[in-house]
Every structure is written in C-alpha cells, then in structure tokens.
UniProtKB/Swiss-Prot annotation:
Family statement: Belongs to the ETF alpha-subunit/FixB family.
Organism: Escherichia coli O9:H4 (strain HS)
Keywords linked to the UniProt accession: Electron transport, FAD, Flavoprotein, Transport
PROSITE patterns, alphabetized: ETF_ALPHA
Residue runs in coiled coils: none
Record-linked SMART domains: ETF (SM00893)
Gene3D superfamilies referenced in this protein's UniProt entry, alphabetically: HUPs (3.40.50.620), TPP-binding domain (3.40.50.1220)
Protein name from the UniProt record: Protein FixB
GO annotation, biological process: carnitine metabolic process; fatty acid beta-oxidation using acyl-CoA dehydrogenase
C-alpha cells in the first residue's frame, strides 16, 4: 500500500496551504483539512479537501496550538492511523509536538521528501547542518510531519470541487499558556514561495542601510527580497520570514541573485533548486561561486546601482 487511507492538513500560514494540499493528494485517498475560518475552508475544498474541519471558539488569550487536544480527538475518531502534515513554521513545530504526544505518534521535522511504503511514511530531511540527507521510516500508526517550504509544488484551486464542512468546538486544555499581551511586529507582506525572481542579501552587503540598494534592484526587475540567516537572526536587519536556508525557506525561483552571500551549505540547500543562480561577492574564493551559473567578483555596493540602472532601461 503506497498511500495512507487519510491525511490531515493544517497550515497557520495561508501561503503554505496549497503545497501541503498537493502533497496530501499524492499521499492519501482522503484529505481532511483543519481551518480557522470560513474563507480558509472554501480555499481548502478548492485545493482538494474532501472534509474541512473548522476550529471554532478559541478565546482570544489562548494560542492556536491549544487546539491540539480537539484536533487529536478528531483524528483518532476517524481512523486508527493516518498522516498529519504541517508547515515547518515555529507554530507548526509547536503544534506537531503537541499532536505527537496526544497521538503517540512519531514526529519528524523539516521533511524535504515524503513517501509511503507498506502503509508507513518514509521521510527524508537534511542532517548535520545540511551536509547529508537522513532517511526515517516511521513505524507508529500516526505520523506527524512538518514540511519544508518547496517540498511540494503548489496545488491549483478548482472552484468546481465539493467537500463536506464540519465544526470542531474549542475545549480548554488542562494546562495551557495564556497570552497576556500582544505587540505588533513590523513586517512587510512576504510571499517568497511564489516568487519567480529573488534578490537575496548576506552580510557582505555591509550594513542595513545598503539593503536599500537591493530593494531598488527588486523594484527594477519585479523581484522579491530575501536574505541569509545571519542577516535576519544575528544582525536583525531583516525579518525572520525572509531568510533562506535549511531551517526556513527552501526556494525554487527562476532566478536567485545572491548579493554578499558566502554560500555556506546551510544557506545553499534553501536556494540550490533555483533554475539560475547569479552571485555577487568581492571574495573570489567564496563558496557561492561553486553553485552559481553566473558571477561577478566585486563590491556589491558599487555593482548594484549599475546593475539596477542597466536593467531599468
């Protein structure tokens, strides 16, 4: 048997749902999708869900992952085994851990390949910081997986599809974290998964102010702006949602223009599926040039304005 009888899907990030649904179609005969609102439910059915389960009634001071109890109950009530697919976001991984505990299921994070053999999930993901690929065969009846961005192509919506809609009511967990306050995070809308062209900056750009040079190039060619992990996590120059690498975004754009990025393996596993890689780096021995189809050795601060002017003509 090379498919599960059913798969359960949830995404806290709407842009990740289409790819999870495409993966679900390949892995199971019946697709169940948990959603947070009616609009997401309509989208899920158009993407191929047979059953939509609307999570309802959570108090404002509780976290989404506190739905884990009723989600696990629903999953158990509809089969003695099954596959759960979640995005490898921070919330996705928190929810995966809670579901794994409640379902007595193995949890595998950051999956880059998923297949079914003899009714059991076989998962591949990067190990040793991206230096190797590990393979796991999950033996528990339920399997909970968080999926790396780009593992599956995005499913295409079909308005003619139909499905059944159900409601799952909130039940307060015995122990939970209560949210006492919220602070709005300054963040731009990011949809890098769908970008055809990506300009990505590393610490070689020199300063936060110099990122404006890359932004101008993005505007000139219609690209999205991304970055390496150190730019987001260490320097705090850009949002976490924009960094490319093994523990975050795995992109497949037509063009990936790496600016001031050294090209360490942990970054390149997130960009190496690009159709064309163009690198700008002043270090001629930078590892990025081993991956690049085209490259310029030089100072990005001087090259970017000239490149923008040429491409904007």
């Amino acid at each position: 048997m090379n498919t599960f009888s059913q798969v359960w899907v949830f995404s806290d990030t709407p842009s990740r749902l289409p790819e999870l649904m495409n993966g679900a179609q390949a892995l199971a005969n019946q697709i169940n999708t948990f959603v947070l609102n009616d609009a997401d439910g309509v989208q899920a059915i158009q993407l191929g869900a047979n059953h939509v389960w609307k999570l309802n009634g959570k108090p404002d001071d509780r976290m989404i992952e506190d739905y884990a109890g009723v989600m696990a109950d629903t999953i158990r009530q509809h089969g003695a085994d099954g596959l759960v697919l979640l995005p490898n976001t921070r919330r996705g991984k928190l929810l995966a851990a809670k579901l794994g505990y409640r379902l007595k299921a193995a949890v595998s994070n950051d999956a880059s390949t998923v297949s079914v053999q003899d009714g059991k999930a076989t998962v591949k993901h990067m190990v040793y910081g991206g230096l190797a690929i590990g393979e796991e065969r999950i033996a528990t009846p339920y399997a909970v997986l968080t999926i790396s961005s780009g593992t599956f192509d995005a499913a295409q919506p079909d308005a003619s599809r139909t499905g059944e809609t159900h409601t799952v009511e909130w039940q307060a967990p015995a122990v939970a974290i209560t949210r006492t306050a919220t602070q709005a995070r300054q963040s731009n809308s990011v949809d890098l998964d769908k970008a055809r062209l990506v300009v990505s900056v590393g610490r070689g750009i020199g300063s936060k102010e110099n990122i404006a040079l890359a932004e101008q190039l993005c505007k000139a060619i219609g690209a999205e702006l991304a970055c390496s992990r150190p730019v987001a996590e260490n320097e705090k120059w850009m949002e976490h949602e924009r960094y490319v690498g093994i523990s975050n975004l795995m992109l497949k754009p037509e063009l990936y223009l790496a600016v001031g990025i050294s090209g360490q393996i942990q970054h390149m596993v997130g960009a190496n599926a690009s159709q064309t890689i163009f690198a700008i780096n002043k270090d001629k021995n930078a590892p990025i040039f081993q991956y690049a189809d085209y490259g310029i050795v030089g100072d990005a601060v001087k090259i970017l304005p000239a490149l923008t002017a040429a491409l904007a003509r």
